[in-house]
Amino acid sequence: MSIKFKTFTQIDGAFDEVIEGSPRIYCTPSGKFPSMTSILAVITDKEDGLAKWRERVGAEEADRITNEAGARGNDLHEYNEKYLLNQLDRSELKGQAKLLFNRVKRYLDEVEATIATEVPLWNADDQYAGRVDAIVMMNQHLTILDQIIQENL
């Protein structure tokens, strides 16, 4: 069975940015701000939970799972972005990321137009910044898309 691909209207509007070091700092027109991911890493106890999980499953298994999840997430991110930019070739789809893409495609098909992908955004008042996967028109509204993948998707 062949999956039908949609063609999206492209609207130009992206801008450049510079990222420095770790933790990630975005250089915005309003100043330098830490990334949202860096802020969340400081205020959550994620490292302790990951260390306990790593100890429970073993270092080798933890590395394997982490590497596979990272590769799958990167592939899916690439598929989603290319799809929104009308650049995805069916032959690129592979493995578990292909299955995930086929599950999220129905939501991407609700997009009316792609404004920009990989867009840096910031809040000068609260002094944080980040990058979203896409800004699109959806249901006649500007909408931010940002991929977050969980194992049970």
Segments from the language model and where they lie:
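Metal-dependent nuclease catalytic cores that hydrolyze phosphodiester bonds in DNA/RNA
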Residues: M1-A129
